[in-house]
From Swiss-Prot:
Family to which the UniProt record says this protein belongs: Belongs to the AB hydrolase superfamily.
Function: Catalyzes the hydrolysis of diacylglycerol in vitro and may function as a key regulator in lipid metabolism, namely by regulating the intracellular levels of diacylglycerol. 1,2-diacyl-sn-glycerols are the preferred substrate over 1,3-diacyl-sn-glycerols. The enzyme hydrolyzes stearate in preference to palmitate from the sn-1 position of 1,2-diacyl-sn-glycerols.
Active site: 142 (charge relay system), 238 (charge relay system), 297 (charge relay system)
This enzyme's EC code(s): 3.1.1.116
Transit peptide: 1-20
Protein name in UniProt: sn-1-specific diacylglycerol lipase ABHD11
Keyword field: Hydrolase, Mitochondrion, Transit peptide
Post-translational modification: Phosphorylated.
Lineage: Eukaryota, Metazoa, Chordata, Craniata, Vertebrata
Cellular component, GO, one term: mitochondrial matrix
Gene Ontology molecular functions: carboxylic ester hydrolase activity; lipase activity
Species for this entry: Danio rerio
UniProt record, GO biological process: lipid metabolic process
Length: 317
């Protein structure tokens, strides 16, 4: 039985890097649910350990303009809905078509035992081909940022511009104890046939022991789903757990992406540090690095207006 388990910017200060590298300063087998929350079945799940692309679920927000579409890629534990309000605003303000996509093992996309940047890039390019999108602006947050970078470096002709949100092309240090989050989610126990509000409260109470920040608990709880009275995590916790080192890492590249690139970090986040600048310059020689004040890792949630303004400014010729 297959399983389904869960932004004005401050002034920019030049760092003296190529192409204006700069930064700003100040600144988510049903069995006995009483013995643990299972990961409910997802139709279309992969049963083979294969690099074959899966058919990703996505939402389209149509704009009236003919400019290159924007494609949003969410982070670990996230889903396409994380960017819905951002997408709607960008459609209104730019006229561009905007897509938000669920990665494999996330949201409503199929489950697979394989979760690497190669496979996630393959999924994305497969979808773009299906939709006859020959070029796009890729905007990826965290894990999605690494998928966006991998795509730009391996298939640059597909990417007109690149926005990488609060992540770098390197090993992600243990800023967050993802292993503990996954284990805490696996250990959540919820009885069947109870109201969703009650189930959510019970799950949050159990997560609170490990996940101290309420905002993070609320984010993880967006993955709690009910089917036929049974509650489970829609993300594939097993695959995420098995591939966490792959997700925290980044593939090696000798190629570069020469297109316009924006690395957008939160000033209160440690995911893009000065230690990462040399590798960013090497792989993305025309990159700008900017920070949004008072924003954490979840920039788009903390400072949505600043986040949107940053993207619109970056899109201007």
């Amino acid at each position: 039985m297959s399983n389904f388990a869960m932004s004005a910017l401050c002034r920019v200060f030049t760092r003296g890097a190529p192409c204006g590298l700069s930064s700003c300063s100040s600144v988510t087998g049903l069995r006995d649910f009483c013995s643990g929350v299972s990961r409910l079945d997802r139709a279309g799940s992969d049963s083979m350990r294969t690099a074959s692309p899966v058919n990703l679920t996505y939402d389209v927000f149509d704009g009236k303009g003919d400019s290159t579409p924007l494609v949003f890629l969410h982070g670990l534990f996230g889903s396409k809905s994380n960017f819905h309000s951002i997408a709607k605003s960008l459609v209104q303000r730019t006229g561009r078509k905007v897509l938000t996509i669920d990665a494999r093992n996330h949201g409503k996309s199929p489950h697979s035992p394989v979760l690497t940047y190669d496979t996630m890039t393959s999924d994305l390019t497969h979808l773009l081909g299906q939709l006859h999108i020959g070029k796009c602006v890729l905007i990826g947050h965290s894990m999605g940022g690494k998928v966006a970078m991998t795509t730009a470096l391996s298939q640059p002709n597909l990417v007109e511009r690149l926005v990488v949100v609060d992540i770098s092309p390197s090993l992600t240090s243990a800023h967050t104890n993802f292993h503990a989050y996954i284990q805490a989610m696996k250990e959540v126990k919820i009885p069947s046939d109870i109201p969703r509000s009650t189930a959510r409260r019970l799950a949050e109470d159990q997560l609170r022991k490990i996940v101290k920040e309420r905002s993070v608990r609320q984010f993880l709880l967006t993955n709690l789903e009910e089917q036929n009275g049974q509650y489970g995590w829609r993300i594939n916790l097993e695959s995420i757990s098995n591939h966490l080192e792959d997700i925290l890492g980044f593939p090696e590249f000798d190629t570069t992406y020469e297109g316009p690139t924006l690395f957008l970090g939160g000033s209160s986040s440690a995911y893009i540090s000065s230690d990462d600048y040399p590798e960013i310059q090497r792989l993305f020689p025309c990159a700008d690095i900017q920070y949004i004040p008072d924003a954490s890792h979840w920039i788009h949630a903390d400072k949505p207006l600043d986040f949107i303004s940053s993207i619109i400014t970056f899109l201007q010729p």
